[in-house]
């Protein structure tokens, strides 16, 4: 069959270690045999970032901004040991953080559900997407130890000289205190990105807060979400047959455990930090978790696996030993990016190809072929394959599926 034409370019961001090896296999064996796609390639290996003083990361982020879609391989965020290992000029910042700061938007983590991989929460038969508002609150707070008895006040001075002052607490003795903040604009952007993600998936959106206690602070999140929804999304949601609701965080946590999935959970910063890990563990494996960064306007997206570079396996690979590394989340980084590309470009065949490759991955595992991490979740009697064998199984199954298109 003729290759499927991808109308607009996709930014491809390469990474490090074991995931870098798998990344190349995905591109060469699963993507390029079927798609005619213009890939704008950026090498974000730690060596390249060091060589360019991290300029390559900034260039890659700006390219995603220009073309609208990026797919990213896992990368090393250097610590002291890595600086020494690679002889780096300095301890470069997380590429994900740099890209996120340039693109803005919200990170949505979505699990890949495979029937025969047991879940800690068996009722979760469909994905639960957690969107985390990665700005402000505890993560930008000023906190300190209060040395002894005294009065804690909070003061705001406007640029026009207007002042607001609140007495927070009369300390009878030593303790701790904290002041934190958020911005209306950031909350609105968070709302837009969350609603756009829900629309894209065709799933309902729930915002969780504790507005009964933090009436002004969390109340602002609730009010701004409602405002954005009513003004820009109510009609679109109605047409798509989905809903938006605000829930109290305690009620939402309980509901999430009861429900089967297929919803987007918009979380404040701290809640998102905690609940995204709860959800990941509940679904069984970080090796089956994708991460999608979506801009507020819903027009710029970057997809990647939610796991790291699998250093332990890379060390085995360097010694010439076969590994059993799970490529599924990295494959889904490609498919999620391509799916958005197809939707943006209005090219249904590209979307269909992405969905086909995803189904092939799931069906391959459900058919009993898998890597060691998944086999261990199933039980001691489950056979597993090397990375190469599993990859070949996916390639063969994809070939068979694509032959049906002719």
From Swiss-Prot:
Catalytic reactions of this protein: D-threo-isocitrate + NADP(+) = 2-oxoglutarate + CO2 + NADPH
Pfam families cross-referenced by the UniProt entry: Iso_dh
Site (Critical for catalysis): 139, 210
Enzyme Commission code(s) on record: 1.1.1.42
Domain of life according to the entry: Bacteria
Binding site residues for NADP(+): 72, 75, 77, 82, 308-310, 313, 326
Binding positions (D-threo-isocitrate): 94, 96, 100, 110, 132
Key words of the record: Glyoxylate bypass, Magnesium, Manganese, Metal-binding, NADP, Oxidoreductase, Tricarboxylic acid cycle
Note describing how the cofactor binds: Binds 1 Mg(2+) or Mn(2+) ion per subunit.
Cofactor entry: Mg(2+); Mn(2+)
Gene Ontology molecular function: isocitrate dehydrogenase (NADP+) activity; magnesium ion binding; NAD binding
UniProt binding sites for Mn(2+): 250, 273, 277
UniProt similarity note: Belongs to the isocitrate and isopropylmalate dehydrogenases family.
Job of this protein: Catalyzes the oxidative decarboxylation of isocitrate to 2-oxoglutarate and carbon dioxide with the concomitant reduction of NADP(+).
Assembly, per entry: Homodimer.
Protein name: Isocitrate dehydrogenase [NADP]
Gene that encodes it: icd
